């Protein structure tokens, strides 16, 4: 996270920031903080591109888009310690996922934002399978 803080504090005008797997080796709490820094960079006008396998990053982005337009946004920002620089307009975010086809090839698929944010089927399917196993394996 320190390099991102340095970028924000430096005042240097970057054309863009591209980061592969920014969540690598980070606890989910730090992933959320790192995502907050990336959003701050975006709100400073720095285009940010990331690749991720982190549902934590995805959910934080969704939360910040939802909070931006929430009817109680100011109240919730105070309650949870966010500032306007931490929030995102839905139209400022684009998400894609790689999807395998039946021919063994992979193609890029644009994801549409719902009123709850972006839904990533490849993440959700894996998480649902894990939850299903948890319940099955806990049965007596």
Report residues per predicted region.
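Switch/communication elements of ASCE P-loop NTPase nucleotide-binding domains
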Residues: 1-137
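Carbohydrate-active enzyme catalytic cores, enriched for enzymes
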Residues: 140
């Amino acid at each position: 996270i320190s390099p991102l803080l340095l970028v924000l504090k430096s005042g240097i005008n970057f054309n863009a920031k591209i980061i592969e797997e920014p969540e690598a080796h980070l606890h989910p709490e730090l992933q959320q903080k790192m995502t907050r820094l990336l959003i701050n960079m975006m709100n400073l006008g720095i285009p940010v591109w990331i690749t991720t396998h982190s549902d934590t990053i995805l959910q934080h982005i969704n939360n910040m888009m939802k909070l931006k337009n929430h009817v109680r946004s100011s109240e919730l920002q105070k309650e949870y310690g966010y500032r306007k620089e931490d929030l995102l307009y839905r139209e400022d975010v684009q998400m894609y996922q790689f999807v395998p086809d039946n021919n063994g090839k992979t193609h890029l698929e644009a994801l549409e934002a719902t009123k709850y944010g972006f839904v990533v089927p490849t993440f959700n399917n894996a998480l649902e399978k894990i939850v299903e196993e948890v319940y099955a394996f806990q049965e007596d």
